[in-house]
Every structure is written in C-alpha cells, then in structure tokens.
C-alpha cells in the first residue's frame, strides 16, 4: 500500500504540472510555437505517468499496471485477511491519452516541379490550320486561354484551351489534352478536342511552370505495400508542405507525398531521391510490420500511423510490441475541449485511490495494534497460568517432602523400640 501510494504521489505531481501547462495554454497571447512547446511537455508528463504506472512494483507484483486485488493475511486462521483493491492508473484510464492544447495549422501543399521553363511544342501536330493558328494564323490569332495549362489530378492529365481562331478555323477553338515533359515543355500531339470541355476537377497552372516531379517506383511500391491501390498510387504527387499558424506565421513543413486527401511525410535522400517516412512495429500476432507516416494529429502536421483502424503518434508506435506490451494511447485528432475539467477529473480519480490506500494502511495499523494487544494479553495469561501451575507444584512438592520426612521419623522411632527391649534383656 505504501509503495503504491508513493507512486500515486508522483503521478499526482505530474498531473498538477499538466494542469499548470493547460492553464498557460488557455492564454490567447500564446503563439502557435508556444502551444507546441507546452504540448511537448504535456506529452512528456503523460509518458512519465505511463512509465510509473507500468514499472512500479512490490515484490515483483506491478501495482498500477492493471486492476488487481491483493489479499494480505493478518491473522492465524483462514479468512483473517485484508484485501487491497488496486486500479490501473495511466493516461488512458485517466482520460488524458488524447489531451491536446495545440491549435490546428493551416496546411498547404504545393506540387514539386522539375526545373526548366515551358514552351508549347506543336511539331507533331498534323492539323496545319491549328498548328499555324497556335503559332499565329491568318484567320484570327490563336492563344492558350489565360496563358495557362490545366492539370486534372483525378486522371493525372494536362489540358489547354485554344481560343481566338475565327472564320473557317473557329471550329478549332476548344479544349485539347497535352503532355508536359520534365523540362516543362507542353506538347500538343492531337487535334481531337476533349468532349465536354475542360474537366471540372482540373486546376490551372501557369504555362511556364514545369511538370510536377513524378513519383519514383520505390515510392509507389511503398504506397501499394501499405494497401493503397496501384491506380491511386499512380496519381500520387510529391509536394512541399507549409503551415500557417493562427498569427499568420508560415513555417516550412518539408516534403510529402499526396494521395487523394491524405499526405504522407517524405524525406529527400542524399542521392536526390525521395522516400516516405515509415514506422516499424510488432503487431498482435508477433509479426514485424511497417506503417507509412501520415501528416495529421490535432495540429495537422504531426506524423501519425494507422494500425488496426486506430491512429497513433508515429514516435510512440515506433518499435512498440502490440502483442507483449499494453495498448498505446491513440493520437489526439483535435484540440481537447475543457482540458482543465478533464485534468481535474483525473486528479479526483487519483485522489480516490490514494484515499482507499490510506484507509487500508490505517486498517493495517489497527490490525497490527490489535495483534500486539492479543499477543500481550495471551503472554500475560500464559504467565499467570504458569505461575499458578508452579505454585501448585511447589505445594505438592512441599507436602511430599513433609510426608517423606514424617515417614522417616516414624520409621526411625519404630526401629528404636526393639533396640530398647533388647537392651533390657541383656
């Protein structure tokens, strides 16, 4: 009980510090970086609570790692016991595993482009009028609408819209699919217009922008190995990340790989190639698995991994053994509402267990005192009994001695009478 209470005292100290930090975070003058620093310490404090819970033990018994009842024998007979009800106390059971005071960043991603300017190449175009028109024709002057190329991420295709042709060449105005080389050169290979016009999902990029860098085979393999379809992996884009906080400050977020609405954290290697950040762990079956690090969490930029439908901080899941170790706390998906109320509830939970343990310690003290009194009383009773027995035996011994002495005296006298008679006869 004392060992457990000592551990709970340290947990209480950590919770008090977490509450102080939560009070600080409620101040609107904090910048986003201030909140990040506060959250970092809160996370460390909660990790320490989990460590204390998992490692505190008495005689090999972990006293806070799980709900348990310890039975202590306090008497000499069966049933003379006192039970200690122990509870699992960690960030999860306290309801603080997803405590987060950060504010969400405004996340922006921009496709990584290869170097070089872009030019419109019509060398392979077999329509003389259109080819001449794009370069400057007689029947009006053709131009790429708004001077932009459009990209449709859904189908991973590029388009331009030709306008300005007149008279007999007016029918050539419309939307055409084009290809974009790594150096940014836009090639118009066909004369067949796109049915239905510009796709609704296409977004404009300036004509002079180079083509986004294509994902390498290695990166696509990482995506497909994680369960993403080959079709979706083929549509993925390498992007640069930036985050804008509530005060309008923008910070660089490095590289990422965008697949649909999801963005995975990526790293540029020394050889210039890119790879998605991964986390290795051991699943519930004891198998080593690898998960892709996705950008998310309450702030929108924390690296998280999804394992068995649950989302964890990548830093916590790294190397974790889900078969042999306790379940991890899930990553916070949003800023915690009423954090002080949650912390106060956690403190009340710890205080309740400490009160129970204090009461048990008082019971132990009472049992020890009672046993001491019993021992003293029994010792005194035994002493009195032994004194009485001794007195009885002494009395019996005295009686026996008296009888023995009396018998000896009578026998001596009896022997003396015949001697006297014989003396007279002589």
What are these regions (language model features)?
Residues 1-118, 164-165, 317-426:
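Primary detection of the long, small/polar-rich alpha-helical "axial" segments characteristic
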